[in-house]
């Protein structure tokens, strides 16, 4: 335990919190343009072809964003919205594409968890 005199001379140093999503710059989402749309394979023990895209953001950052859901309509020069949230089995992918916003369509025939995939309610 430090004495009062020690604390007067040299105060305690606050720990600086490091952001997991630096490219968002404390914003909830950011807009960007797809520079490359491709598939990649996850780390062991998983196996799949995960859909991802390289995005040039409005603030100049270039990041990799995961495209969730079954099927998508993204291609090069598509304007998309990204949010934070990493993909655990894809190293370097720290952002998610927001489905149903800007040029990214919602997931076709989605019935459950629709709000996460940009799908409006189907009126019966």
From Swiss-Prot:
Mention any Pfam family matching this sequence: Ribosom_S12_S23
Record-listed 3-methylthioaspartic acid modification sites? 89
* GO molecular-function term, one example from the UniProt record: tRNA binding
GO biological process terms held by the UniProt record: translation
One GO cellular component term noted in the UniProt record for this chain: small ribosomal subunit
Task: Report disulfide bridges, numbered on this chain.
Answer: none
| Record-linked Gene3D superfamilies | Nucleic acid-binding proteins (2.40.50.140)
Provide this UniProt record's keywords sorted from A to Z: Methylation, Ribonucleoprotein, Ribosomal protein, RNA-binding, rRNA-binding, tRNA-binding
| Assembly description | Part of the 30S ribosomal subunit. Contacts proteins S8 and S17. May interact with IF1 in the 30S initiation complex.
Give the HAMAP family listed for this entry.
Ribosomal_uS12_B
Q: Which family does it belong to?
A: Belongs to the universal ribosomal protein uS12 family.
Function (record text): With S4 and S5 plays an important role in translational accuracy. Interacts with and stabilizes bases of the 16S rRNA that are involved in tRNA selection in the A site and with the mRNA backbone. Located at the interface of the 30S and 50S subunits, it traverses the body of the 30S subunit contacting proteins on the other side and probably holding the rRNA structure together. The combined cluster of proteins S8, S12 and S17 appears to hold together the shoulder and platform of the 30S subunit.
What protein am I looking at? Small ribosomal subunit protein uS12
UniProt lineage: Bacteria, Pseudomonadati, Pseudomonadota, Gammaproteobacteria, Enterobacterales
Q: Which gene encodes it?
A: rpsL
């Amino acid at each position: 335990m430090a004495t009062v005199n020690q604390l007067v001379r040299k105060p305690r140093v606050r720990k600086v919190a490091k952001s997991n999503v630096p490219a968002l710059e404390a914003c909830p989402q950011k807009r960007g343009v797809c520079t490359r749309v491709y598939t990649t394979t996850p780390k062991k023990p998983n196996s799949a072809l995960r859909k991802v895209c390289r995005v040039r953001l409005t603030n100049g950052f270039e990041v990799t964003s995961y495209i969730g859901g079954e099927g998508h309509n993204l291609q090069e020069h598509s304007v998309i919205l990204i949010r934070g949230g990493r993909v655990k089995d894809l190293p370097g992918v720290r952002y998610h594409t927001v489905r149903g916003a800007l040029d990214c369509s919602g997931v076709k025939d989605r019935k459950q968890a629709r709000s996460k995939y940009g799908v409006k309610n189907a009126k019966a």
